[in-house]
């Protein structure tokens, strides 16, 4: 059902290269927004100055653009609820903090980590329980004395002593029964923490649905508590719906985190995965279009997607399956699109721009390569023979096989037209005069022409390479 009031957000921190789990989260949010005709908001959570990297910020923007996950509000686009970099929203956070303090929903806390641990030990309370709400009732006189002594407070939110429950769009009912201590909203420097800025930005930007990784589930009760406080002070009038997407597991059944090389988005882009294949596979990490079908387009996903169909169990990343799905989408491209996407990989491989003639040769070979590869880098290696002057071949052959090749050369030199059908007929005719398996001779010729055991079809490769280059390569192979 379409509902333009739906607003979701993708709000990564620019602390490293984008990883696949992050891209999967962006995809599910984008599809959810497009399904409902709502808004997809892109926000950069760059409040932690010690970890932020400008390069990472650019990579996040470039990643979404390359994937075609366009945003309705955010960096490079703006919107009525900006700015969309948290580092530029400090005045908003301070205004909210002032209102929370004035309403006695938050308070100043001066306790140090060491003081909290000491009190817990003296009270026989486990240290891991953390803060003990000690500063809730500090008098103004005590606070003044603390400041006089040079101590700077942090701001904490008052938590009610009650269970927090909500209906998760993926996991169903979730209930938190353990008491949650009053948690920090700021550092002692006054810098706002994630616990404050994330829900505040969602409230100001009128986010209706929060779809994010399951690793953030534990922070949800604190955010719900803050939302209720924001309702009290008039910042918003609702708590958004939450849906926690399953964890993605990698090799060895370990969580696929940003520290794993196999999770780096740029690894897949550089290897020649295409956006259609990568998005298709990432959508399968927690969701499927049907029990009998794994491949589909982005538009088909939008039509079929229901967040309540997302599975709650951990999803396992399978590189081989990702390759197979990418191969399917490579085959689905029209030939010209395949050619255009292949050109940058070929130029990077060769280290030089392709000439007009080289591009024509590449375009001609593409129909014979497209169905044989899983990655654009594989395709680039497969067509290298067309675009270089010399190839290296080290392969042992018998004297009889050399005789066959010489006979092939003699007949090929007599051809009037250099076309694949005539080339094939000529070579087969030469082989028939010798008691050898055609497959073996074809393999030798393939190596002589392309330098590879796996290549585009032999006779079409020879036609596109051209008479002179093809005959020279066979001659070189025979004489060396």
Curated annotation (Swiss-Prot):
A motif ('KMSKS' region) lies at residues 255-259. It is an enzyme of class 6 (ligase). It catalyses: tRNA(Glu) + L-glutamate + ATP = L-glutamyl-tRNA(Glu) + AMP + diphosphate. Its main location: cytoplasm. A motif ('HIGH' region) lies at residues 12-22. Keywords: Aminoacyl-tRNA synthetase, ATP-binding, Cytoplasm, Ligase, Nucleotide-binding, Protein biosynthesis. One of its GO terms (molecular function) is zinc ion binding. GO terms for cellular component: cytosol. ATP binds at residue 258. GO terms for biological process: glutamyl-tRNA aminoacylation. Its EC number is 6.1.1.17. Pfam families: Anticodon_2, tRNA-synt_1c. Monomer. Belongs to the class-I aminoacyl-tRNA synthetase family. Glutamate--tRNA ligase type 1 subfamily. NCBIfam families: gltX_bact. This is Glutamate--tRNA ligase. It comes from Tropheryma whipplei (strain Twist) (Whipple's bacillus). The lineage of its organism: Bacteria, Bacillati, Actinomycetota, Actinomycetes, Micrococcales.
